[in-house]
């Protein structure tokens, strides 16, 4: 029996991110919170340099980490530093917090594919960092858009958005010299 796996992603206000990710095949559960920062016991009013993030528990027999990341890059703009929509500041940065070297490798490879694809107009600024503490947000933030369907969000599914994978040759060139890989 394969056990569930965990991912932590940040990409703007956690309400919209959670709402779209929760419905993906293989996602078992989600919760919103704060990660990647410097304050213990982070709260909405005091989260220091933490990003608003979503912790995702997923069944790897139904979906994989790469598929989750491809969807993540579809529903938020990974090229705007410390900003999504009208939300500005480090709390709203794009970030992937990985749990092991395999997740790190997949994250970096997916970012390289996003950059090579030209689907976004600029350079990807998504932070890739080891997962640390995840401080669960207050109850009023959990499942927010499920309770308030017309609430604020700056995330949306882009119909027809598909991330192509780089060819083996371009991936090799990118790993040897990042500026040659595009």
UniProtKB/Swiss-Prot annotation:
The keyword GTP-binding does not apply. It catalyses: L-methionyl-[protein] + [thioredoxin]-disulfide + H2O = L-methionyl-(S)-S-oxide-[protein] + [thioredoxin]-dithiol; [thioredoxin]-disulfide + L-methionine + H2O = L-methionine (S)-S-oxide + [thioredoxin]-dithiol. InterPro entries: Met_Sox_Rdtase_MsrA_dom (IPR002569), Met_Sox_Rdtase_MsrA_sf (IPR036509). One of its GO terms (cellular component) is cytoplasm. One of its GO terms (molecular function) is L-methionine:thioredoxin-disulfide S-oxidoreductase activity. It is an enzyme of class 1 (oxidoreductase). One of its GO terms (biological process) is response to oxidative stress. Its EC number is 1.8.4.11. The active site is at 13. Keywords: Oxidoreductase. PANTHER family: PEPTIDE METHIONINE SULFOXIDE REDUCTASE, PEPTIDE METHIONINE SULFOXIDE REDUCTASE MSRA 2. Has an important function as a repair enzyme for proteins that have been inactivated by oxidation. Catalyzes the reversible oxidation-reduction of methionine sulfoxide in proteins to methionine. Belongs to the MsrA Met sulfoxide reductase family. This is Peptide methionine sulfoxide reductase MsrA. It comes from Mycobacterium tuberculosis (strain ATCC 25618 / H37Rv). The gene is msrA.
């Amino acid at each position: 029996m394969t056990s569930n796996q965990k991912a932590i992603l940040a990409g703007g206000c956690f309400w919209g991110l959670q709402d779209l990710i929760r419905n993906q095949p293989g996602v078992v559960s989600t919760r919103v919170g704060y990660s990647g920062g410097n304050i213990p016991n982070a709260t909405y009013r005091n989260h220091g340099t933490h990003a608003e993030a979503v912790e995702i528990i997923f069944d790897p027999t139904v979906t994989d980490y790469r598929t989750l990341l491809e969807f993540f890059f579809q529903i938020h703009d990974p090229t705007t530093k410390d900003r999504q929509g009208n939300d500005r500041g480090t709390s709203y940065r794009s970030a992937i917090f990985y749990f092991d070297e395999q997740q790190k490798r997949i994250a970096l490879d997916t970012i390289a594919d996003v950059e090579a694809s030209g689907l976004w107009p600029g350079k990807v600024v998504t932070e890739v960092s080891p997962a640390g503490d995840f401080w669960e947000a207050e109850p009023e933030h959990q499942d927010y858009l499920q309770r308030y369907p017309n609430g604020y969000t700056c995330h949306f599914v882009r119909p027809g958005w598909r991330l192509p994978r780089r060819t083996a040759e371009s991936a090799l060139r990118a790993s040897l010299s990042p500026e040659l890989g595009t």
